[in-house]
């Protein structure tokens, strides 16, 4: 076997007949498979042991030679070579075809490669190959032309006219092979290149296509005639197995049936040719053989597919590769692994951040080899076999050994669907009773897991390296931040939030208010003995609390609550005392208003201070982020565990319950509803009188009900009582939101009909009052639509993620600095008045490209090529700087990846990104994972704001990444200049906008309903939109440059996600958009040897021109091309990656003709061939590290040890 980690690239080509015979271990001459009586393979049949190897390890067919002793000997009785049975997966056979047969991939593909090579139409080829017409191969002296088609009748007429032997014309693939052999590639290419200089239009396109194919053959060293087969390879039998079922029947792979048809027809053809049968019979048999081979290679590509039992089309060789069930996606990219298990998950509230509970039964099976080795090592079992028996009997001493084996051996937990890298994390196993895996409650958010029956898979890293990697890189305690936005992903939820909220509540006049304590311990004693309540406002001496107080806060008394003293006791030292949920308190210090002098009257002080709101979920997230910023991973995960324990403990003590009496009643609800009814009546009257259109009426009515619902909601918020359990759950962020609350206590409001339109009849009741039958019926519409939408959305979002991963999987951080001199100018992203993404968020964690100066003083805030920290970003914003030039992925010069400086920090760690980080995959996951949170709908605004439907949500994201023409397209100006006039034309209901540039004037026609974005006299740059809508990016690319398009697309993606409340770091979107603009289309090839119209990678294009310029030749010119992500994935340089994505046969056909070489730069192609991936620790620079000279002198160490032993 080849060591897969040693080879550097993989090449594909067309197999020559000699090569096929060289691969083969013998010819398959008979269609037989196995003998039905002896169950042994037939000789010279499809399962022959002499050709394909023995069925049993180290044993020949007749059983004369048995054992490894006879390795590689050939038995003289049965002729089988003694070797392993695995050779039946590797050894090929062949069939010598009685007539040449065309390969359907090259004849049928689009464009037909055979047709281009011969300059014949695919239709003409089909007529010749399937024996409908003759083709003239050599016209000799006659007036026929080479490659001319003749029907049977014309052929006979020409023979009569010119006499036998006066010209050569043939039928079938044989004729095509002769023609292909006649093609002189070099001569053809030279002639076509000459012709290319003069022609235009369709002819030019055709010549470029032909040149493309011919030069591909010339470069790759494939011969044109190899597209026609003389020998057919037979794949190894274990890849097309035949297995016996219980009833003595056999189940077999479809390929065996297809091969049998080929062999039968081939043998019949041989016999007919030996008998000198009439030509017409032989021709028919040849045609049948051609069809049989076509079906074997690609069933259904031509004509009706051949079906097996039950009208099911047979799976041909091509189908074995294609699709989700094909070889690529099912077996190469989606292998099942040993040392794994799955079970239902249950909550493990007592676990630490880095632990998970593993059922003993599961662990004993997973760790079996380790336990067995340990049993032998500890001499509890004589040998491995005895140890195995012990483990299977589950002897008592096995469990003790298991405890030691499991200790500090991390396991991986994975929950499907794995939408981002946090869907697989490492934990240290803790053995537990029961059968469910226990999961830490804080890890749920990353997995999107809950305990309503979810299952998770567990995997065991085996090697030392794998364990080290799992522990250092994948341990759950390390994954505090979410890679998509750098915010904490492990935030407390539900009970934990509720407990901490309850703990930090304040109430006036609770028992023991105004007591002053010396230490936190005193506070706790007082609380336990019932002198004070958790919510009681008290005073405590600041010096007893180990916190960073300011000068004038020391030796004073802090006014706080009992609960907050407890809450602050778990916060890491060095953090301010948190007394109110504000950022100032969190980042700098406690507010001075909460302090009093020792002699002051605390009752008076308390009267002057309002009660402070408790700490909600969002604020707990801010605390975690701040702790992480200051103390990094370990301290944060310890704090998180303390926060979790405290939250659970306090919510248990609080014991919140919910009863119907807890749902408040809005006193004047009926007044609000009556007013709405009256308003609707007025609107209907106006409509009846013809004052408003039906659309306007509909919008007004739905508007009225929306307002009614909102005013009820407002009333509820104003009157809410913070001690109400439902309000506490909602306000704290533990469960539910205002909309759920208003459905319980206000009104349910408007519902969507099945067609997605909102119904005018609202549901006036709420759940407390109960719904009428009709209202219940209406509300089921909305509920069902919600369910179906979610299901559809999940599938759509998953497919989007798959395409994104495919296009960016080879983007890896490859070097420290690419040394580019270009940058990206960034500012706030806003739509009209609404802020989408502020400059501050775009700056943090990026490198500058130019120094930033203070606009007023002119002093330098930060130099060139420096990392912008949060503090510096804050300074830049405070200095009122509007634009900053930063290093960006868009302008990075690193080929096949990005450099550290252009990428910035790794959002998941908050530190500089490391070389080897697979940023492409992370970017794809970051964009794809929140895809399910985006809406599905394209909004029908019902003719209010604009006539066009604005696409939003998931469809808009797809539209952007697939570079489609957007719905509701905005017209852009192609010249820079002044808007000279906007003229309305009442007759055609249009407006004409005239833009006057320096050299030319353009006018654009827009509809009356379109919202204008420009006004008369305004100066605009080319590419600026004239009306509201989405710009078509391909058009923008023609008018402006690539960087403008990239910037526009980045803004559009951010708008779509942020409008739904999803935050994603710019850099992820930059990575994806850069992949869409990686290619250049050659416009003029200069003196290089590329063809005009070729697509090239930017880096290859630059290298090509560099060489041309160094040799003093004319460089090629090209223009950037914007490709959708699907097309970009298929245009990748790696044929393995492209073939495993989509259109497998097309990709492979093309790659074979070009003799493409895959340099295995991406992740996917390495996974396919089973090589370690070139990212992270698998990167070349990390794998070949020579250890430094042995610094410790080993013998000396040993001597010291022996001395201590003796002493």
UniProtKB/Swiss-Prot annotation:
Is this entry keyworded Transcription? yes
Q: Which Pfam families match?
A: RNA_pol_Rpb1_1, RNA_pol_Rpb1_2, RNA_pol_Rpb1_3, RNA_pol_Rpb1_4, RNA_pol_Rpb1_5
Chain sites annotated for binding Zn(2+) 1: 60, 62, 75, 78
EC code(s) of this entry = 2.7.7.6
Could you state one GO biological process linked to this protein? DNA-templated transcription
Q: Transferase among the record's keywords?
A: yes
Q: Which SMART domains match?
A: RPOLA_N
Subunit info here reads: The RNAP catalytic core consists of 2 alpha, 1 beta, 1 beta' and 1 omega subunit. When a sigma factor is associated with the core the holoenzyme is formed, which can initiate transcription.
Please explain the role this protein plays, according to its UniProt record. Answer: DNA-dependent RNA polymerase catalyzes the transcription of DNA into RNA using the four ribonucleoside triphosphates as substrates.
Q: What name goes with this protein?
A: DNA-directed RNA polymerase subunit beta'
């Amino acid at each position: 076997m080849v060591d897969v980690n040693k080879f550097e690239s993989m090449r594909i080509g067309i197999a020559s007949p000699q090569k096929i015979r060289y691969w083969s271990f013998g010819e398959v001459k008979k269609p037989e498979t196995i003998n039905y009586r002896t169950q042994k393979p037939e000789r010279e049949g499809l399962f022959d042991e002499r050709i394909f190897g023995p069925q049993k390890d180290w044993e020949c067919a007749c059983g004369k030679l048995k054992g490894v002793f006879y390795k590689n000997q050939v038995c003289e009785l049965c002729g089988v070579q003694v070797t392993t049975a695995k050779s039946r997966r590797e050894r090929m056979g062949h069939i010598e075809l009685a007539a040449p047969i065309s390969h359907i991939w090259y004849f049928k593909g689009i464009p037909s490669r055979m047709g281009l090579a011969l300059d014949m139409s695919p239709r003409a080829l089909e007529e010749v190959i399937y024996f409908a017409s003759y083709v003239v191969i050599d016209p000799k002296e006659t007036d026929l032309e080479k490659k001319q088609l003749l029907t049977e009748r014309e052929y006979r007429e020409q023979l009569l006219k010119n006499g036998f032997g006066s010209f050569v014309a043939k039928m079938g693939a044989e004729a095509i092979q002769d023609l292909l052999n006649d093609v002189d590639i070099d001569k053809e290419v030279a002639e076509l290149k000459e012709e290319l200089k003069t022609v235009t239009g369709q002819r030019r396109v055709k010549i470029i296509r032909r040149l493309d194919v011919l030069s591909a053959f010339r470069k790759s060293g494939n011969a044109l005639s190899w597209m026609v087969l003389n020998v057919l390879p037979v794949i190894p039998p274990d890849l097309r197995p035949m297995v016996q079922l219980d009833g003595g029947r056999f189940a077999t792979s479809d390929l065996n049936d297809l091969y049998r048809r080929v062999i039968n027809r081939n043998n019949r053809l041989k016999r007919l040719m030996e008998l000198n049968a009439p030509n017409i019979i032989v021709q028919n048999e040849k045609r049948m053989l051609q069809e049989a081979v076509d079906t074997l290679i690609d069933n259904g590509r031509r004509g009706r597919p051949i079906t097996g039992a039950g009208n099911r089309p047979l799976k041909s060789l091509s189908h074995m590769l294609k699709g989700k069930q094909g070889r690529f996606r099912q077996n190469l990219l989606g292998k099942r692994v040993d040392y794994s298990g799955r079970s239902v998950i249950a909550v493990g509230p007592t676990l630490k951040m880095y632990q998970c509970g593993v059922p003993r039964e599961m662990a004993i099976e997973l760790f079996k080899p380790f336990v067995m080795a340990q049993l032998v090592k500890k001499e509890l079992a004589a040998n491995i076999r005895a140890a195995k028996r012990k483990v299977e009997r589950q002897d008592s001493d096995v469990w003790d050994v298991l405890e030691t084996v499991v200790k500090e051996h991390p396991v991986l937990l994975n929950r499907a669907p794995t939408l981002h890298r946090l869907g697989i994390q490492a934990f240290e196993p803790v053995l537990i009773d029961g059968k469910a895996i226990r999961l830490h409650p804080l890890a749920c958010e990353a997995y999107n897991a809950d305990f309503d029956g979810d299952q998770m898979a567990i995997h065991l890293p085996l090697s030392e390296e794998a364990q080290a990697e799992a522990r250092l890189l994948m341990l759950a305690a390390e994954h505090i931040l979410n890679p998509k936005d750098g915010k904490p992903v492990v935030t407390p939820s539900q009970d934990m939030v509720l407990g901490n909220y309850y703990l930090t509540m304040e109430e006036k006049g609770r028992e023991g208010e105004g007591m002053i304590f010396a230490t936190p311990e005193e506070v706790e004693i007082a609380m336990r003995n019932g002198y004070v309540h958790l919510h009681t406002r008290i005073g405590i001496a600041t010096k007893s609390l180990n916190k960073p107080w300011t000068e004038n806060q020391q030796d004073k008394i802090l006014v706080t609550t009992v609960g907050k003293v407890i809450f602050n006791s778990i916060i890491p030292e060095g953090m301010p005392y948190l007394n109110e949920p504000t950022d100032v308190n969190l980042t700098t210090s406690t507010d001075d208003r909460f302090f009093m002098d020792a002699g002051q009257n605390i009752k008076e002080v308390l009267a002057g201070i309002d009660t402070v709101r408790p700490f909600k979920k969002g604020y707990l997230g801010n605390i975690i982020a701040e702790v992480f910023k200051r103390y990094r991973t370990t301290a944060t995960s310890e704090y998180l565990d303390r926060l979790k324990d405290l939250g659970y403990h306090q919510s248990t003590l609080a014991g919140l319950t919910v009863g119907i009496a807890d749902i408040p009643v809005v006193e004047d609800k009926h007044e609000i509803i009556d007013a709405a009814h009256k308003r609707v009546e007025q609107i209907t009257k106006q409509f009846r009188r013809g004052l408003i259109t039906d659309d306007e009426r509909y919008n007004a009515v739905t508007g009225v009900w929306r307002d009614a619902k909102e005013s009820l909601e407002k009333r509820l918020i104003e009157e809410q009582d913070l001690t109400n359990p439902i309000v506490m759950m909602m306000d704290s962020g533990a469960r539910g939101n205002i909309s759920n609350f208003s459905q319980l206590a206000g009104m349910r409001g408007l519902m969507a009909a099945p067609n997605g339109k909102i119904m005018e009849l609202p549901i006036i009741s709420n759940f407390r009052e109960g719904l009428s039958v009709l209202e219940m019926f209406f509300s089921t519409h909305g509920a069902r639509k919600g369910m179906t939408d979610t299901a559809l959305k999940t599938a759509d979002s998953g497919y989007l993620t798959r395409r994104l991963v495919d296009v960016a999987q080879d983007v890896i951080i490859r070097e420290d600095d690419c040394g580019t001199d270009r940058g990206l100018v960034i500012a706030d992203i806003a739509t009209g008045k609404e802020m989408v993404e502020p400059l501050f968020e775009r700056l943090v964690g990026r490198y500058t490209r130019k120094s930033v100066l203070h606009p007023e003083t002119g002093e330098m805030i930060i130099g060139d090529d420096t990392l912008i920290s949060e503090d510096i970003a804050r300074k830049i914003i405070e200095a009122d700087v509007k634009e900053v030039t930063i290093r960006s992925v868009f302008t990075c010069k690193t080929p096949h990846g990005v450099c550290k400086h252009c990428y910035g920090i790794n959002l998941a760690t908050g530190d500089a990104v490391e070389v080897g980080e697979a940023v492409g995959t992370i970017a794809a996951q970051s964009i794809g994972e929140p895809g399910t949170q985006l809406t599905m709908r394209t909004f029908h605004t019902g003719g209010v704001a604009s006539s066009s439907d604005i696409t939003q949500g998931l469809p808009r994201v797809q539209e952007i990444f697939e570079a489609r023409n957007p719905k509701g397209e905005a017209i852009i100006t192609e010249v820079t200049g002044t808007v000279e006039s906007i003229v309305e034309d009442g007759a055609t209901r249009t407006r004409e906008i005239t833009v006057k540039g320096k050299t030319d004037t353009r006018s654009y026609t827009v509809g009356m309903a379109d919202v204008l974005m420009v006004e008369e006299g305004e100066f605009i740059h080319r590419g600026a939109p004239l009306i509201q809508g989405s710009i078509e990016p391909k058009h923008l690319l023609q008018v402006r440059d690539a960087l403008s398009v990239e910037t526009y697309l980045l803004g559009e993606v951010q708008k779509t996600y942020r409008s739904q409340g999803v935050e994603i770091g710019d850099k992820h979107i930059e990575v994806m958009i850069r992949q869409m603009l990686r290619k250049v289309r050659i416009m003029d090839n200069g003196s290089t040897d590329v063809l005009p119209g070729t697509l090239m990678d930017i880096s290859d294009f630059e290298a090509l021109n560099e060489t041309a310029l160094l040799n003093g030749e004319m460089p090629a010119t090209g223009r950037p091309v914007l490709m959708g992500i699907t097309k970009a994935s298929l245009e990748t340089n790696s044929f393995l990656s492209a073939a495993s994505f989509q259109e497998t046969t097309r990709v492979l056909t093309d790659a074979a003709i070009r003799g493409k070489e895959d340099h295995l730069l991406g992740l996917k192609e390495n996974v396919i061939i089973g090589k370690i991936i070139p990212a992270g620790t698998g990167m070349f620079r990390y794998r070949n590290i020579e250890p430094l000279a042995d610094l410790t002198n080993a013998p000396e160490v040993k001597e010291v040890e022996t001395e201590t032993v003796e002493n």
